[in-house]
Amino acid sequence: MGKIKRADLDLIRCFAIIFVISVHGLSYVGFYELSNPSITLFVCHLIRVIVIICVPLFLILTGYLSAEKEYILSFKYLEKPFRLLAIYIVCALICSIPQFMRGEIKSFFVALFEFKAAPYAWYLAMYLGLYLMIPFLNEFIASKNGGGKSIFVLILLVTLPTVTNNCNFNSFEWWNGSKEQSSQLFPNYWDELYPIMYYMIGAFLKRNDAMANKLKKITLIIKH
């Protein structure tokens, strides 16, 4: 028996894709260069407020669809991230051809490890990080005794950026520089629990959806 297609989830995906296109489309119509108050600026701001939820929608969907699955950290589970990393490296090499021609090899490697060597690579970095954390998140969600080990791993993962992002590969005097000049070994959005929060919202919705279905079944049984 094949999987049942969920029209509501497909609809959310469609809206999320349209919102992504809309967010980036605003930069092409000159929205970010507008400064004087006008109807155009107001309308663009209103559109941006609505469509900026594009990434959160994808993260919530990920939590909804993945929270109740059992994942094991194995070579097979890690195959997908390695394939995506290979694609990223190829794209980064192509996008960095002008840098190579100027002899900027060092800046290329810095950008590569910061996921800035290709346009919008931050999104890939975020999803890869979330993908690697899903087994721990799901264990934490399913655990009935508090999931002590999972909590420790989560705390470790979200505090690592603060500890490791205080160096600057472009200067030997990194210790005396500002945080804005630091190189990011781990993206800052992990400090804010941004992806985890939306994943948990999706997991919460899935759990309540399952509970609602159980209540419906119980109600039908009682009626019969």
Language model feature labels by segment:
Residues 113-115, 139-224:
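Aromatic-enriched alpha-helical transmembrane segments of multi-pass intramembrane proteins
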Residues 1-163, 167:
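Membrane-cytosol interface segments of multi-pass membrane proteins
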